[in-house]
Amino acid sequence: TDVRVVLPTPDEPFYSDDTPWYRKDKRYQVLYLLHGAHGDCTVWTRNTGIERYAQKYKLMVVSASVTNSCYVDMVHGGKFFTYMTQELPAFIESTFPVSTRREDTFIAGMSMGGYGAFRLGLAQPERYSCIVSLSGAIDLVLQTRKTSVQMEDVFGDQPMDHTDNDNLWKLEQLIKQGVSIPKIYQCCGTEDFLYESNQNVRRKLEQLGVDFTYDEGPGIHNWDYWDPQIRKILEWLPLKGTLVDA
């Protein structure tokens, strides 16, 4: 599959002095940024200013194309959960100067990618310190009859509820096990077709007592909403604005 990586460049002073471009004792914080249904690894760079924002914060951004897989190992299709949890992180960490510390690693996504951010983040809470959903189909158990994604190809014909593909059930199990839950940021436009679903998720998060931030405002399911939101999210994330120690 295809991967797009945004790697910030050094600031202008390197043109006029002998400062090394990349220091071996420094690493980038990293955001895994997920696309939605019918998207690919290019949608964030084509439709938002994420390259400029990443440069400002000295943040590495990684996006991968996963078709309409919902970021799981499809019953009839690619094994994208395995790819996103094992193969892609191993490639990124062995190829680029990226921090592997939990406090420097974040995951976010819009629409189907919001589901994916929860699915992957809750599967590896030891890897990610923050999970972000923008207009996400977080609770796909309630959405399976309202989507253009071919769910039988993705999940088969077995019920999703009370399985690892049921994000809210999975979250509840982790809490019961005493697992450290990543901080959560959830946002949705008030005119979005997923608004009511996000309200249900919000109420469940409040009920579970997790550490989460919720934001809503005028907007539908499009990039006019997601571009300003990703800027707000980058302000919310614990970004250093510079490289971190290796």
Language-model-derived ranges and their functions:
Residues 1-246:
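Non-catalytic cap/lid and distal C-terminal segments of serine-dependent acyl enzymes
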